[in-house]
């Protein structure tokens, strides 16, 4: 006799954001499959007006809803420049990145719900675990943290808040750190911003040069890849802290290497000539800003696939939409 899989009801916070949108829609598709372990899926976006940085906001919602087996927190304030330089940005970063995860965790525990919390490589920097870094290693979940900007510091506080809230139920939460996340549901992702820069350069710059930093290193990760990591937590009942990033052949990837890989991949796509990328040249530069110069993490969860393959799959799947995006902004 075959037993049906137990269905998990899942709450997705931030379902209108770049990651949350893809997580929510992927789970909805899975919930329709008979052999899936995904049950009812509910998404909460900005339009719900739920103030997650207030202690009881989520708890009140959960008390008046169905029981959720899992809550996936995709909410974050990711504008690192505003978090560093603007008063309102600093407040929003602290509220959404530091306070909200703690209160979300407390609400989930009250309703006996497991939490999957998304965090960042920015909890690390070139100042983290100095000996380990000097030896050329990538960061592991147990590596020393040392954020160098407000965003990273707030995200680390959020991690601590989640872990402390679950201290009596350590198998009830998973923290997935990811890095340089890209997806289609955000025109401010690196890929979209880079392509905007390319279009502008083709129109206005006779040298057709696009400047890219070579003194930042991390690992580009697609929303599709991160979703596989999230599903792995649910399917295998994993708990603790994981680094949800693809593999790399070297110790991290620079923005310059990332941009070159985007160009090379798009040039190999069908109809690539339509978007005129062949004349673009990348100019290496070194910039100093409020970001870690090295925050590359080693993969500890998800498919053992390299970042270049993940990028190629993403760009091939979304080539038409990206070409349309470039055509639209070129007008």
Model-derived segments and spans:
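NAD(P)-dependent short-chain dehydrogenase/reductase
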Residues: 130, 161-218, 224-225
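Adenosine-cofactor binding site in Rossmann-like domains, unifying the SAM/SAH pocket
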Residues: 39-61
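Catalytic helix-loop patch of NAD(P)-dependent Rossmann-fold dehydrogenases
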Residues: 88-95, 99-100, 123-176, 180-182
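Mid/C-terminal beta-alpha module of Rossmann-like enzyme folds, strongest
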Residues: 229-230, 235-290
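SDR active-site strand-loop-helix element
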Residues: 13, 44, 71-75, 115-121, ...
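NAD(P)H-binding glycine-rich loop region in Rossmannoid oxidoreductase-like domains
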Residues: 53-98, 109
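Conserved C-terminal active-site "lid" loop/helix of NAD(P)H-dependent oxidoreductases
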Residues: 252-260, 281-320, 324-330
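N-terminal Rossmann NAD(P)H-binding glycine-rich loop of SDR-like oxidoreductase domains
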Residues: 2-30
